[in-house]
Amino acid sequence: MNTPKRLLFVTLVASAALLPAVNAGPETALTGPVERYISIDNACAWPNLTVLPDGTIIAAIFNRPSHGQEAGSIEAWASQDGRFWEKRGVVAPHEPDTNRMHVAAGLAQNGDLVMLSTGFTNLQQPGQSKKLPFRDRLLPPWVCRSSDGGRTWTHTNSFPSPPEGFGPFLVFGDIKAGADGALHASAYAQKDDDPEKEDRAWHFRSDDDGRTWRIISVIGTGHNETALLHLEGKRWLAAARTIGPQQVDLFRSNDDGTTWAGPEHVSEAKQIPADLARLADGRLLLTYGTRVADQRGVLGKLSSDEGKTWSAPIRLADSLSSRDCGYPSSIQRPDGKIVTAYYSAGVGDHTRYHMGVVIWTPPSSPPTP
């Protein structure tokens, strides 16, 4: 598939003094040097970052400048440090009059990249009226795999079908390995003909290094996009987006995802969805978008007790010009700096969709709420 040539725009912010808080609430600005980049231009992106064994950072992105309402594919882009990026391959090429716009991504135990991808068809379905562009029917997930760092990919239809009465699964978040080497992922689905539009978030497990998957449990009812993080042993943390207030709830499992306890609210309304990461010093990092008017951007929180308590929000991205923004994904470089990627429909004078990146140093003593 031919894609528009992308231009790279770079902005380096030398001091957090240039990053004022956007409201009078408890959130704080970053301290120390901060780098900001418009890294991949003219793409809605919804980035998901994965670090390869050789240290290369891979961003899985949706490659079109639309909120999923035109034909497009999931691509893999590569960077050595999070600053500059180049296209490496097409993870999930779309078929005619369809798109592949959703992705879950991670590493297999053998070092392969494993991604799951879903999308929509634009073809009117039998017995139904025509829906909005590229919203006629959700396509079942593909299982995508690359053994050469994201350059070439294979695809299978080996992801499980949803339980009877539910529509196809829609994937999200990271694919993580547990203590026993099994891979774990999340996806959500909606009841057919449900007037309440009540999503359920499921937990999945693969015992063959990501080649086939099976349903393990429901994480939350009334929740959809869910990030997973392995803590230790059989303990897991999940950060799930709610349907109603549009906030992030935490769930916990002590039995490798067989059962989940929660929810615990961890963000305010219109602050979604989330990403979870473990830092080198043992702390947890939660990053999430905020679509609150006059506060749009990306926030982060740190936890020193496995997610039981969290710091006050730290402002990572600011002045995004539309509520069409957020979906952060974060990794930590060997030098300790955090690379947080996110998407935005525009910022300041730059009015195109893009993947933005902020490179920052986590504070040693984060602010208390």
Regions found by a protein language model. Give the residues of each.
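N-terminal secretory signal peptides that target proteins for export/translocation
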Residues: 1-4
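Bacterial N-terminal signal peptides
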Residues: 9-18
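Asp-box/BNR beta-propeller blade signature and adjacent active/binding-site loops
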Residues: 21-369
